Amino acid sequence: MTAAQAAGEEAPPGVRSVKVVLVGDGGCGKTSLLMVFADGAFPESYTPTVFERYMVNLQVKGKPVHLHIWDTAGQDDYDRLRPLFYPDASVLLLCFDVTSPNSFDNIFNRWYPEVNHFCKKVPIIVVGCKTDLRKDKSLVNKLRRNGLEPVTYHRGQEMARSVGAVAYLECSARLHDNVHAVFQEAAEVALSSRGRNFWRRITQGFCVVT
């Protein structure tokens, strides 16, 4: 797997291209997920994303695929700019922090309505990020003091079904756990009939990867 951040880099002739767009609340873990996948390094400090584009090459069924991955800003200040990056999206990753019930609720309340408006018929994958923090006792206790709990795997599955996603995946960028699987699944969904026909399958079963 190779990665580049040069905006002008395009797929070589004969290589399929897939545009992946990550959306979700600011700080939910989508940027760390992308950086670990593309560069192999976890960012120890948080810097809010404006908009970033990465190019990554991988294999799908033995054939090269060129991923154009867009990381979008989740802050309200960028609501008018974000839709500029949706055209021609092949697959959407709706990301949330499993230790942030608010970011989880926003998948249904904010992000799904937005992408459904601007990207009709584009397949969706819901991604639960920061799974390593489910075992952070300090964070869990803080949530419990406010009457909250980390988002469970089962609730993530239910959310994916509720927005008609083709898959639900969980990952930990810090532990490099399941990171590659997220983007491998995105590429495979974008290139398969599973992705092309997903809007007809909202009430049917979907793939779950942990």
Curated annotation (Swiss-Prot):
Q: Which residues form the signal peptide?
A: none
Please give the residues making up the propeptide in this record.
Answer: 208-210
**Where is the protein found, in the record's own terms?**
Cell membrane; Early endosome
Q: Where does GTP bind?
A: 24-31, 71-75, 129-132
A Pfam family per the record: Ras
Q: Name one GO biological process term.
A: regulation of small GTPase mediated signal transduction
- Entries under PANTHER family matching the protein: RHO FAMILY GTPASE (PTHR24072)
Write out the similarity annotation.
Belongs to the small GTPase superfamily. Rho family.
Q: What does this protein do?
A: Involved in endosome dynamics. May coordinate membrane transport with the function of the cytoskeleton. Involved in the internalization and trafficking of activated tyrosine kinase receptors such as PDGFRB. Participates in the reorganization of actin cytoskeleton; the function seems to involve WHAMM and includes regulation of filopodia formation and actin filament bundling. Can modulate the effect of DAPK3 in reorganization of actin cytoskeleton and focal adhesion dissolution.
UniProt name for this protein: Rho-related GTP-binding protein RhoD
This chain is encoded by the gene named: RHOD
